Design a protein with these regions (language model features):
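An N-terminal, well-structured beta->alpha segment
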Residues: 1-63, 88, 137-159
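Gly/Ser/Thr-enriched, mixed-charge loops and adjacent short helices
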Residues: 13, 104-159
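Short acidic, glycine/serine/threonine-rich loops at helix termini
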Residues: 15, 51-54, 81, 100-105
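Short, ordered loop/turn segments at secondary-structure junctions
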Residues: 44, 71-72, 94-95, 111, ...
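Active-site cofactor/substrate anionic-group-binding motifs, chiefly glycine-
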Residues: 62-72
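Conserved phosphate-binding catalytic cores of ATP/NTP-utilizing and phosphoryl-transfer enzymes
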Residues: 70-87
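Short gly/pro/ser/thr-enriched loop/turn and capping motifs at secondary-structure boundaries
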Residues: 73-76, 97-100, 113-114, 121-122
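Active-site microenvironments of hydrolase-like enzyme catalytic domains
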Residues: 91-109
Length: 159
Protein backbone atom coordinates (compact mmCIF):
# COMPACT_ATOMS: atom_id res chain seq x y z
CA UNK A 1 0.00 0.00 0.00
CA UNK A 2 1.29 3.45 -0.91
CA UNK A 3 1.93 6.00 1.84
CA UNK A 4 2.27 9.24 -0.18
CA UNK A 5 0.82 8.67 -3.64
CA UNK A 6 -2.93 8.61 -4.02
CA UNK A 7 -5.00 7.99 -7.12
CA UNK A 8 -3.56 10.98 -8.91
CA UNK A 9 -0.31 12.10 -7.33
CA UNK A 10 0.50 13.40 -3.87
CA UNK A 11 -2.02 15.76 -2.29
CA UNK A 12 -2.29 17.54 1.02
CA UNK A 13 -2.33 20.84 2.84
CA UNK A 14 1.04 22.57 2.34
CA UNK A 15 3.13 22.91 5.50
CA UNK A 16 0.85 20.45 7.30
CA UNK A 17 0.63 17.00 5.72
CA UNK A 18 2.32 18.08 2.47
CA UNK A 19 5.70 19.34 3.64
CA UNK A 20 8.91 20.64 2.15
CA UNK A 21 10.65 17.48 3.34
CA UNK A 22 8.14 15.16 1.63
CA UNK A 23 8.17 17.04 -1.70
CA UNK A 24 11.96 17.50 -1.78
CA UNK A 25 12.52 13.86 -0.87
CA UNK A 26 10.09 12.73 -3.57
CA UNK A 27 11.93 14.71 -6.24
CA UNK A 28 15.31 13.52 -4.99
CA UNK A 29 14.02 9.94 -5.09
CA UNK A 30 12.63 10.51 -8.59
CA UNK A 31 16.08 11.66 -9.70
CA UNK A 32 17.69 8.54 -8.22
CA UNK A 33 15.20 6.16 -9.85
CA UNK A 34 14.13 7.75 -13.15
CA UNK A 35 17.33 9.70 -13.90
CA UNK A 36 15.63 12.65 -15.65
CA UNK A 37 17.79 15.28 -17.31
CA UNK A 38 15.09 17.83 -18.13
CA UNK A 39 11.94 18.48 -16.10
CA UNK A 40 8.94 20.56 -17.18
CA UNK A 41 6.87 22.08 -14.37
CA UNK A 42 3.44 23.67 -14.67
CA UNK A 43 1.29 24.95 -11.86
CA UNK A 44 -2.12 26.24 -10.97
CA UNK A 45 -3.01 29.52 -9.28
CA UNK A 46 -3.18 28.28 -5.68
CA UNK A 47 -1.28 30.43 -3.19
CA UNK A 48 1.12 27.60 -2.30
CA UNK A 49 2.14 26.63 -5.86
CA UNK A 50 5.33 28.73 -6.01
CA UNK A 51 6.43 27.51 -2.59
CA UNK A 52 5.96 23.90 -3.74
CA UNK A 53 7.97 24.72 -6.88
CA UNK A 54 10.86 25.76 -4.60
CA UNK A 55 10.55 22.48 -2.69
CA UNK A 56 10.63 20.51 -5.95
CA UNK A 57 13.80 22.28 -7.06
CA UNK A 58 15.51 21.62 -3.75
CA UNK A 59 15.09 17.89 -4.31
CA UNK A 60 16.81 17.87 -7.69
CA UNK A 61 20.57 18.21 -8.07
CA UNK A 62 22.01 21.05 -10.11
CA UNK A 63 22.54 18.61 -13.00
CA UNK A 64 18.80 18.55 -13.68
CA UNK A 65 17.33 21.25 -15.93
CA UNK A 66 14.06 22.43 -14.37
CA UNK A 67 11.86 24.59 -16.59
CA UNK A 68 8.93 26.45 -15.02
CA UNK A 69 6.28 27.00 -17.68
CA UNK A 70 4.07 28.84 -15.21
CA UNK A 71 0.30 28.57 -14.98
CA UNK A 72 -0.99 26.23 -17.68
CA UNK A 73 -3.75 23.61 -17.82
CA UNK A 74 -2.76 20.07 -16.85
CA UNK A 75 -3.56 18.86 -20.36
CA UNK A 76 -0.67 20.91 -21.75
CA UNK A 77 1.96 18.72 -20.05
CA UNK A 78 2.05 15.95 -22.70
CA UNK A 79 2.49 18.63 -25.38
CA UNK A 80 5.39 20.20 -23.45
CA UNK A 81 7.08 16.85 -23.00
CA UNK A 82 6.77 15.93 -26.66
CA UNK A 83 7.54 19.37 -28.10
CA UNK A 84 10.59 20.19 -26.00
CA UNK A 85 11.93 16.72 -25.19
CA UNK A 86 11.62 16.83 -21.41
CA UNK A 87 11.78 13.38 -19.86
CA UNK A 88 9.72 14.19 -16.77
CA UNK A 89 6.79 16.46 -16.07
CA UNK A 90 5.52 17.73 -12.73
CA UNK A 91 2.10 19.32 -12.35
CA UNK A 92 1.59 21.37 -9.19
CA UNK A 93 -2.15 21.23 -8.58
CA UNK A 94 -4.75 19.66 -6.35
CA UNK A 95 -7.36 19.61 -9.12
CA UNK A 96 -10.85 19.64 -7.65
CA UNK A 97 -9.77 19.67 -3.98
CA UNK A 98 -10.50 22.72 -1.77
CA UNK A 99 -8.18 25.70 -2.24
CA UNK A 100 -6.11 25.08 0.91
CA UNK A 101 -4.91 21.80 -0.65
CA UNK A 102 -2.20 21.40 -3.25
CA UNK A 103 -0.08 18.61 -4.60
CA UNK A 104 2.20 17.22 -7.26
CA UNK A 105 1.52 14.83 -10.08
CA UNK A 106 4.45 13.16 -11.82
CA UNK A 107 4.19 12.59 -15.56
CA UNK A 108 6.47 10.27 -17.53
CA UNK A 109 8.10 11.20 -20.83
CA UNK A 110 5.14 9.70 -22.73
CA UNK A 111 2.70 12.09 -21.05
CA UNK A 112 1.15 9.52 -18.69
CA UNK A 113 1.07 9.43 -14.91
CA UNK A 114 3.74 7.21 -13.42
CA UNK A 115 2.96 3.51 -13.14
CA UNK A 116 2.05 2.24 -9.68
CA UNK A 117 5.20 0.11 -9.53
CA UNK A 118 7.38 3.19 -10.03
CA UNK A 119 5.44 5.17 -7.40
CA UNK A 120 5.96 2.30 -4.93
CA UNK A 121 9.70 2.26 -5.72
CA UNK A 122 9.89 6.05 -5.22
CA UNK A 123 8.12 5.75 -1.87
CA UNK A 124 10.44 2.98 -0.69
CA UNK A 125 13.41 5.18 -1.55
CA UNK A 126 11.99 8.33 0.14
CA UNK A 127 12.63 7.09 3.67
CA UNK A 128 16.36 6.70 2.92
CA UNK A 129 16.89 10.16 1.38
CA UNK A 130 19.21 12.67 2.95
CA UNK A 131 19.34 15.79 0.80
CA UNK A 132 22.87 16.94 0.04
CA UNK A 133 23.51 20.66 0.30
CA UNK A 134 24.11 20.79 -3.48
CA UNK A 135 20.42 20.16 -3.98
CA UNK A 136 19.55 23.68 -2.84
CA UNK A 137 21.07 25.46 -5.82
CA UNK A 138 18.00 25.55 -8.08
CA UNK A 139 15.77 27.91 -6.10
CA UNK A 140 14.73 29.77 -9.26
CA UNK A 141 14.13 27.50 -12.25
CA UNK A 142 14.21 28.94 -15.72
CA UNK A 143 10.96 30.20 -17.20
CA UNK A 144 10.49 29.11 -20.77
CA UNK A 145 8.09 30.84 -23.14
CA UNK A 146 8.76 28.66 -26.17
CA UNK A 147 5.66 26.61 -25.41
CA UNK A 148 3.42 29.66 -25.41
CA UNK A 149 4.91 30.97 -28.65
CA UNK A 150 4.58 27.56 -30.31
CA UNK A 151 1.01 27.24 -29.07
CA UNK A 152 0.11 30.68 -30.43
CA UNK A 153 1.65 29.87 -33.81
CA UNK A 154 -0.30 26.59 -34.01
CA UNK A 155 -3.47 28.36 -32.93
CA UNK A 156 -3.05 31.10 -35.54
CA UNK A 157 -2.47 28.52 -38.27
CA UNK A 158 -5.76 26.83 -37.36
CA UNK A 159 -7.89 29.98 -37.59
Amino acid sequence: MKKYFGTDGIRGIPNKNLTKEIVSNVTCSVEDILKPTSVAVILDTRDSSLEILDWICEGFSENIEVINYGVLPSGSMPILLETFGHNLGIIISASHNPSEYNGIKLIDENGSKLQDEIEIEIEANIENISLPSAHTSLKNPKRDIRFILNFLIRFLILI
